[in-house]
Each structure stands twice: as C-alpha cells, then as structure tokens.
Amino acid sequence: YRQGFDVYSFDHRGQGLSDRLLSDSDMGHVYDFTDYIDDMDIVVKKHDLSEYQQCFIIAHSMGGAIATRYLQTHPEHPVTGLILSAPMFGINLPWYLSPIAIPVTQIMSAVSTLPRYAPGHQAYFPKPFEDNPLSQSYGRYQWFRNLYTEKPELQVGGPSTRW
C-alpha cells in the first residue's frame, strides 16, 4: 500500500485457509478444475478494478494454471500482465507412469464413490529438509515448517484421484 500498490489475495478452495471439501482435510480435492476458474472470476468481479491503469496477477504453482486458464476463458478480464512462479502446466510423472496415470485414476474413481489419495500420495507428512523437493534453503524450509506447525490448518497432503 505504501509503495502505491493495492494487493488482493485469496486461497483457492482446499488450499491455505480456504474451506476443505472433504472430511479428510489433508486430501487435496476439487470436484472440477473449472470450480477454481469460477472462484477466480468471482474474486476478480468482486473488486472494482476499472480505476487501475494496470492490473497484474502473480500466481504460483497450481495458482499459475488457474490464472492462465482464467485469462484464456474470460477474454473480458481486466488483467494487463501475468507473472507466474513455477506454474503447474502438467504433472511431473516418471515416463513409465505417464501413459497409465489417467486411466488408473479414472478406474479408481469409478470403483469407489469416495475420493481416495492418488497413487503414491498420502496425508500430509513433514519431510526432513534433506528429502524435500521444494527448497534448497534450510532457513526458508525451517520457516515453512514452523508455519505449518503453528497453523496446522494450512497443511495439505496429496491430491485425490478426482483432483
């Protein structure tokens, strides 16, 4: 604010401090990816952005995929720029799992009406620094770990088969 910027931020459903959709609050889940896009449209429309000369979206990881898809599907958007940090434009799988990942999750979803963790995923489990794939900075990782310890409602484990 003091630098002349107005910042609007939100946690998309099932992440951060937003409501979880399942009784297993660790499971990353959404009924349909377009729900994320619809939520973003609601947030953008809630704020009168017409007074701004420029409007940027800064998005990280899955937020990058959501922001990109929002801009693609809402040509009337007020956004003049998009800044993406490690956008999730695909799921990083070993080469031998890529061809079977979608059929396996479709079968799992058809067999059970209840969402289950996607293969290879589980409830939230804090990895030691040496085994974490997200940060090479011990200080940053400890800050992140401390935040999750102080605010366990932020923790999210693996995604569901329906995610």
Where are these regions (language model features)?
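Alpha/beta-hydrolase active-site loop
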Residues: G28-D48
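Localized chelating/binding microdomains
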Residues: D6, S25-H29, F56, A67-H74
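Short loop/turn motifs at secondary-structure junctions
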Residues: G4, E51-Q53, H77-V79
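Alpha/beta-hydrolase-fold enzymes
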Residues: M62, I66-P159
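Alpha/beta-hydrolase fold nucleophile elbow
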Residues: L49-S61
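Conserved serine/cysteine hydrolase catalytic core
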Residues: W163
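Conserved alpha/beta-hydrolase
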Residues: Y1-S23
